[in-house]
Amino acid sequence: MDYHWRGELGSWRLLLLLLLLAAWKVGSGQLHYSVPEEAKHGTFVGRIAQDLGLELAELVPRLFRVASKRHRDLLEVSLQNGILFVNSRIDREELCGRSAECSIHLEVIVDRPLQVFHVDVEVKDVNDNPPVFRVKDQKLFVSESRMPDSRFPLEGASDADVGANSVLTYRLSSHDYFMLDVNSKNDENKLVELVLRKSLDREDAPAHHLFLTATDGGKPELTGTVQLLVTVLDVNDNAPTFEQSEYEVRIFENADNGTTVIKLNASDPDEGANGAISYSFNSLVETMVIDHFSIDRNTGEIVIRGNLDFEQENLYKILIDATDKGHPPMAGHCTVLVRILDKNDNVPEIALTSLSLPVREDAQFGTVIALISVNDLDSGANGQVTCSLMPHVPFKLVSTFKNYYSLVLDSALDRERVSAYELVVTARDGGSPSLWATASLSVEVADVNDNAPAFAQPEYTVFVKENNPPGCHIFTVSARDADAQENALVSYSLVERRVGERSLSSYISVHTESGKVYALQPLDHEELELLQFQVSARDAGVPPLGSNVTLQVFVLDENDNAPALLEPRVGGTGGAASKLVPRSVGAGHVVAKVRAVDADSGYNAWLSYELQPAASSPRIPFRVGLYTGEISTTRVLDEADSPRHRLLVLVKDHGEPALTATATVLVSLVESGQAPKASSRQSAGVLGPEAALVDVNVYLIIAICAVSSLLVLTLLLYTALRCSALPTEGGCRAGKPTLVCSSAVGSWSYSQQQPQRVCSGEGPPKTDLMAFSPCLPPDLGSVDVGEEQDLNVDHGLKPRQPNPDWRYSASLRAGMHSSVHLEEAGILRAGPGGPDQQWPTVSSATPEPEAGEVSPPVGAGVNSNSWTFKYGPGNPKQSGPGELPDKFIIPGSPAIISIRQEPTNSQIDKSDFITFGKKEETKKKKKKKKGNKTQEKKEKGNSTTDNSDQ
């Protein structure tokens, strides 16, 4: 019963031990196998795939592979069945020497995901090596005087096997004088000695032959034999002796050459030469002992003569002979065991494997970049290695197993900020002082298309003169992409939209690669003042990224339109207009008025009127207003004046070069009583067509009055709707930007005749544009312009589309009065509440100024149907027409243009003003006021006749 219970207890203990062993294997993440040495090729070792939990089908797709640093070809894994087998002959003695433990360390690596498993294959020893003696014959010299029980050390045999296979037993052949004694302190250090049984007698037996046999503990047993030749010496019967038979010394491996290991002392009771002792290494010592140590023959001092290395050999067994000088000499023996102590003299080694480079900048955290293994040949704390990574990098080291690390991604990457990392891995051991080694690893960051092309500014302003040649280069856009390679290749394109009735691409094109913007056709300022569009920049990445930039192209005016006459019209007799003037009229009486318009703007549309001198009538009593075009008398007519005058009026703009038109007016002088009759005869005869035209003008004036009333009502309704309605997105529509010009005689505001278009892609039309004509007169004062600024347009104001009915027909434009007032019309406006320049209001009935007076610029391209509206309150401070404002303010721009010039005359000609926005008085109102005006003209004419230069 008791035996049965003990058996069950032993079984439980064995089962518990197996469970603990299995749990240790699982926790360590390492597989253990064993294989005997000298196994044949193909010998089964273990089902490694099954033990690792891997399916056979996934071995090839996951790139199942086995890696080993030194013994890669000894073992192999079949990818068909997942079995680890012997690939080539394994010799344990060659692999591990005399080490008690011998294992082959393997690394099993699989991808997707990357995993590393560690496998230890223990190589079991097989008794395949017999005991071996270093020499075939061992010679001994024994004095006959030696006492029984004298001992003579013998060189033992060595067995390359380990464990029980290397445990040796010795036996000596049968002999009367000698026996064998083995002193077994441990299995590694057995002292084999030949013991003298009884005293020798050289005369009886001068030599003895024995055989020493060594047998190992393997199954089956293997043996080795050496012959012992014992020579018996005579006379000197006392040998030197040591204090102890074995000495043990410990010394560090970094001890310098010449360092004393031990100083031996032997004694000999003999006297004289028989007592003189010399020390030497025994003839049986190994060569490596002689290479690393030396002994002084006289003193017995053992010193270091070569560099010691704990990693190569940590124990030296030195056999020392102390020999006297007798005849024959006698020797004493001892053994010195020198144990080498480890010193931290080996730098850790770093190995980088399984690099996954380059790394995409959008890689996830935890991505494995590389596998790192470290090793230190030292032992104990000197061989314990820790691995670290340089700070401030987006990577970290993760310990996966002893002396194995994974380099993983720890934070986000940005190639545009850092395109490559030079990592330094440091391995440091635990010695004192510690040693370290470094390894450099270059990690390149692969680009990902995560940056869109960017322009230097969101909007550009471009100025282009009209009538440009087709295909001319007007601007170049450039966008920069922070990415690399194809992700940074930028292509440009036009954001297509409609410009009125046509597509944008019919006006503008953009070069795909260079970003150059071309005008495909000549631009016309009178048709299109502002063209706003967008250019798109897109890279070649996947997916592509892009951005847009806005271009505002302002078309600058050129003097390409000559003045066009409205009145007098070409026709009648010889293309001239006929006027009848009573001889009784006084000075300043308006005889006729020449009306003309210019489709240009600015100075190019500023018209002036000149009366051409006639060769037949060098002294004519008429003059023409410089800016009004009114033909009036310069004095009271008398009988000496010619009854007929042919007046040539030259209409000229101020462009470079100036364009002109000529109007012819026939003036006939009649008596006051004969004027109605002459007029009737003229209407019935020669001037028949003019009479019909006069009747038409009457109807036109009536129609103008009606249309003017309707226009005022429409404007009021439009203003109310504009103030109450919310701003709407602007498109391409007819607009009339205010153009402010300056000259030597003042400043004026001008609105062009033709409906012009201001095209915008996203914002509202720009109504506050101020431009300056480049063709200023030479007498204009200096213009100081600040640094060139881009024209910034306020997008806050988004006026509604004007009523398309707010147009004049051709017949109405022909008959409208050309005198418009500048009353309450702002000349310079930079926005609501900004500077507002006003001019006095004068009527067309105001008499002509005296000679030498300077009139303000009027008629600058403004016809009779031009209207100018005032925004915001007027400035109570009014400058004279001959004065210039100190500064011109360009709305939406910090540029300020200063123009200052003293007027040429303190007096101001008020009769040459053109008033904007005023309707022409009807003939009925003129007739009612004619009497008063005639009286005023006579009074003023009498005072100005002497000063007139016409």
Swiss-Prot record:
Annotated keywords: Calcium, Cell adhesion, Cell membrane, Glycoprotein, Membrane, Repeat, Signal, Transmembrane, Transmembrane helix
One Gene Ontology molecular-function label: calcium ion binding
Intervals, Extracellular compartment: 30-697
PXXP repeat residue intervals: 774-777, 799-802, 832-835, 873-876, 891-894
One cellular-component annotation, GO: plasma membrane
The protein's name: Protocadherin alpha-8
Amino acid composition bias (Basic and acidic residues), ranges on this chain: 909-923
The encoding gene: PCDHA8
The protein's role, per its UniProt record: Potential calcium-dependent cell-adhesion protein. May be involved in the establishment and maintenance of specific neuronal connections in the brain.
Cadherin domain location: 30-133, 157-242, 243-350, 351-455, 456-565, 581-678
Transmembrane segments: 698-718
InterPro entries, alphabetized: Cadherin-like_dom, Cadherin-like_sf, Cadherin_CBD, Cadherin_CS, Cadherin_N, Protocadherin/Cadherin-CA
Region annotation (5 X 4 AA repeats of P-X-X-P) ranges: 774-894
Source organism, top-level taxon: Eukaryota
Chain residue ranges for the region called Disordered: 830-950
Primary location class: membrane
GO biological process: cell adhesion; homophilic cell adhesion via plasma membrane adhesion molecules; nervous system development
Family annotation (Pfam families): Cadherin (PF00028), Cadherin_2 (PF08266), Cadherin_tail (PF15974)
Membrane topology: Single-pass type I membrane protein
Signal peptide: 1-29
Cytoplasmic side: 719-950
Organism: Homo sapiens
